[in-house]
A protein has these predicted regions:
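RNase H-like (RuvC/DEDD) metal-dependent nuclease/polynucleotide-processing core
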Residues: 4-54, 59-264
Length: 264
């Protein structure tokens, strides 16, 4: 399980909170200073693994349906687009420029993406109004409790949108590298050796990491353990918005045809 982050600089040499952490069930969590180091570590782990591998990432694998329609892409097209546009280096990335370009392509206005230290004509610092009838959350996100932040917010307290912009290109590179060995759930049937899935650590009881000096570390530790019993990948209908994989006994809600669970 992976706790992703959108730092624009390498994390400190000494492990800390608000950084990149990942964990295999039964092992101690690992700390990485950059996304590039983590990507390399994931590749080594996959290549060295015996049997099947489930990789869970805590960022959105897609956007609300209307955004995909406006961009003229399905989930594969979105992943390819972001991989082509995003430049991510240890001390710099262009995520705000890419978000502004996505706004131009999707609406021609400074929406839906927002949140930046330096506002521009196509990327505002504050939350904009969305076009009429356009939703802020995917169905799988709206069903969760606690409800997650919007993937459109890139900057500010609790923002998660930058993680998606910088994370999806890593997933796409894994997808291209491992080819027919790898599938992306729930867009593809989870029948291959390597399965990528979106997870939501905040569904776990906060008491598991409350008061811990590095809560990120504890989140991946407990999330990896939560899927120890296996996964029931069965879903009803899933489109290009995707779905979320939760541990057994997660939150209940009205739109759970886009959510699957681990086994108790």
């Amino acid at each position: 399980m992976v706790d992703w982050i959108a730092r624009s600089r390498p994390a400190p040499a000494r492990s800390c909170r608000d950084a990149l952490w990942w964990c295999r069930d039964g092992e101690a969590p690992r700390y990485e200073r950059t996304r590039q180091e983590l990507e390399a570590g994931l590749i080594r782990t996959i290549e060295g693994a015996r049997g099947r591998v489930l990789l869970g990432f805590d960022f959105s694998f897609s956007y609300p349906r209307w955004v995909l329609d406006a961009l003229g892409v399905d989930w594969r097209g979105l992943w390819s687009l972001l991989t082509e546009e995003i430049v991510d280096m240890p001390e710099w990335n262009n995520r705000f420029d890419v978000a502004a370009e996505l706004n131009r392509r999707a609406t021609g206005e400074p929406a839906p993406f927002w949140g930046t230290p330096r506002a521009s004509a196509l990327l505002p610092a504050r939350k904009p109004l969305l076009p009429a009838g356009c939703l802020e959350l995917r169905a799988c996100e709206a069903a969760l409790r606690p409800r997650p932040k919007s993937g459109f917010q890139l900057w500010g307290a609790g923002s998660v949108g930058s993680q998606t912009l910088l994370g999806i290109p890593v997933l796409e590179r894994l997808r291209r590298r491992f080819g027919v060995e790898l599938c992306v759930w729930p867009f593809e049937a989870p029948e291959r050796r390597i399965v990528l899935a979106e997870v939501y650590p905040s569904c776990l009881p906060k008491a598991l990491w409350s008061g811990h000096p590095v809560p990120d570390r504890e989140q991946v530790l407990h999330l990896a353990a939560a899927f120890r019993g296996g996964v029931d990948f069965a879903l009803q209908q899933v489109g290009d918005e995707g779905g979320i994989l939760l541990p057994a006994g997660g939150p209940e809600g009205p739109a759970l045809d886009c959510i699957a669970r681990g086994k108790a």
